[in-house]
Structures are given as structure tokens and as C-alpha cells.
Amino acid sequence: MSTPHINAPLDAFADTILMPGDPLRAKLIAETYLENVVQVTDVRGMLGFTGEFKGRKISVMGHGMGAPSASIYFHELMTTYKVKNFIRIGSCGAIHDDVKLKDLIVAIGASTDSKMNRIRFKDNDFAATANYNMLSECVNTLKTTDINYLVGNVFSSDLFYRPDEEQYDMMARYGILGVEMEVNALYSAAAENHCNAVALCTVTDHIKNHEHLTADERRTELHEMINVALDVALKLPTE
């Protein structure tokens, strides 16, 4: 049985999945890091794969850009395919002066300007947060590396190009470390469906300072984040 957006058999996915936004990055991760890889879905070009990492079955799949797109895949993976552990691996833009290019943010929670949670949570504000055990594993793993990391809140925006950039100053005052587009949707879907989720975001741009990583720098830093995510996946309990 498949879903409208995933054409995979029910047993196609592992209990733990890594999810970048870009389906081609999912393909790169699968082909670079996993063994015995099988492509399990390709509807609308949103590629998904399952393979093995150091003997553990792990899946990787893209989720697209923005909360509406990502929420479709989160929901179908959680409800139909019974995936339990979600690790988002993505990029973000920094807005806080203490956050630098190449920093890795472990997202405790995610504020948002999206109305999706107002619909989901009966017009109330839902505090979308990571699973504590997964968050702890991320921090413990990062402590063994040379990666400069921060743990705190991010902001999930429906707009990539905002017309009101002065809002970034307000977000920084509240301690928001970075801006991206999907973490709030992931944490909310995980809470709704009793799943576990954590998000890792590499700082590839500094919105306030107008600094950006080069293409080569992005590739290197994202690979470091992927290694962390895979190490965390190995430490999670199996179903």
C-alpha cells in the first residue's frame, strides 16, 4: 500500500530516517554513506532510500521546501509507514550576533509565522520542541567533535524572502539563533503522531551580516552535520 506522495511498500522504511530538504542531497547521502542501498520512492521527484550504516537499517528522504510540502511527507511517513525517529539535516540563516557561519545549531524548539499549528491546535499556540533523548544524543555526540555548535531555538518561516527584515532584530532579542522553514512542522507532526524528532541546522548564511558560505564550504560543513546525524541514529533504540 502506498500513499498519494510515497510509492513505497509498507516495510520499505527503517524506524529512523534522515531528512534533508533536497531530494538530490538525500540521494548523495544514501550513495555516499549507506550500504546495500535501495531507492524506495520517487513520486514527484522526491527521492527516498533505505540502506545500512554500520549494520543498522536507516532511511533517508527529501522533504522539499517549506512547511506545507514537508508536512505531507512527515505525516505519511509517521502514520502509514510507522517511521518513529526523524532527524532533519538542513541549513539555516543566522540572525544572532553570537552565531557564526559554519556553526551547527541543534534546535530545541521552533517558533513560526505559519498558520498550520493554529489549524492543528484549535487556534492556540503550540510549543513545538525536539525529543529530549534525541536532543541529548546530538549534544553528547557533538561534544566529541571539533564542530562549533549551539543549542537553542530557531524560527520556521513561510517566507524565504521576507519584506520585513526588521523582524529579525526582534527574533534575536528573544534568543532565536537561526531562521529556516521546516523544523516547526516536523516537531509539531512528531508530537501529534507520538514520534521522535530532532533537527540539525548548519549556518550557511548570516542574514544580518550578509555573509555566505561558498559552494565548497557548504558541501564540507553539510557532510560534518551528516556524520553527526548518522552517529546519533546508531545510538537510538530499535523498535
UniProtKB/Swiss-Prot annotation:
<feature type="site" description="Important for catalytic activity">
    <location>
        <position position="218"/>
    </location>
</feature>
<dbReference type="InterPro" id="IPR018016">
    <property type="entry name" value="Nucleoside_phosphorylase_CS"/>
</dbReference>
<dbReference type="InterPro" id="IPR035994">
    <property type="entry name" value="Nucleoside_phosphorylase_sf"/>
</dbReference>
<feature type="active site" description="Proton donor">
    <location>
        <position position="205"/>
    </location>
</feature>
<comment type="similarity">
    <text>Belongs to the PNP/UDP phosphorylase family.</text>
</comment>
<feature type="binding site" description="in other chain">
    <location>
        <position position="21"/>
    </location>
    <ligand>
        <name>phosphate</name>
    </ligand>
</feature>
<dbReference type="GO" id="GO:0005829">
    <property type="term" value="C:cytosol"/>
</dbReference>
<protein>
    <recommendedName>
        <fullName>Purine nucleoside phosphorylase DeoD-type</fullName>
        <ecNumber>2.4.2.1</ecNumber>
    </recommendedName>
</protein>
<feature type="binding site" description="in other chain">
    <location>
        <begin position="88"/>
        <end position="91"/>
    </location>
    <ligand>
        <name>phosphate</name>
    </ligand>
</feature>
<feature type="binding site" description="in other chain">
    <location>
        <position position="25"/>
    </location>
    <ligand>
        <name>phosphate</name>
    </ligand>
</feature>
<keyword id="KW-0808">Transferase</keyword>
<feature type="binding site">
    <location>
        <position position="44"/>
    </location>
    <ligand>
        <name>phosphate</name>
    </ligand>
</feature>
<dbReference type="GO" id="GO:0004731">
    <property type="term" value="F:purine-nucleoside phosphorylase activity"/>
</dbReference>
<comment type="subunit">
    <text>Homohexamer; trimer of homodimers.</text>
</comment>
<feature type="binding site" description="in other chain">
    <location>
        <begin position="204"/>
        <end position="205"/>
    </location>
    <ligand>
        <name>a purine D-ribonucleoside</name>
    </ligand>
</feature>
<feature type="binding site" description="in other chain">
    <location>
        <begin position="180"/>
        <end position="182"/>
    </location>
    <ligand>
        <name>a purine D-ribonucleoside</name>
    </ligand>
</feature>
<keyword id="KW-0328">Glycosyltransferase</keyword>
<dbReference type="GO" id="GO:0006152">
    <property type="term" value="P:purine nucleoside catabolic process"/>
</dbReference>
<feature type="binding site">
    <location>
        <position position="5"/>
    </location>
    <ligand>
        <name>a purine D-ribonucleoside</name>
    </ligand>
</feature>
<dbReference type="Pfam" id="PF01048">
    <property type="entry name" value="PNP_UDP_1"/>
</dbReference>
<dbReference type="InterPro" id="IPR000845">
    <property type="entry name" value="Nucleoside_phosphorylase_d"/>
</dbReference>
<dbReference type="InterPro" id="IPR004402">
    <property type="entry name" value="DeoD-type"/>
</dbReference>
<comment type="function">
    <text>Catalyzes the reversible phosphorolytic breakdown of the N-glycosidic bond in the beta-(deoxy)ribonucleoside molecules, with the formation of the corresponding free purine bases and pentose-1-phosphate.</text>
</comment>
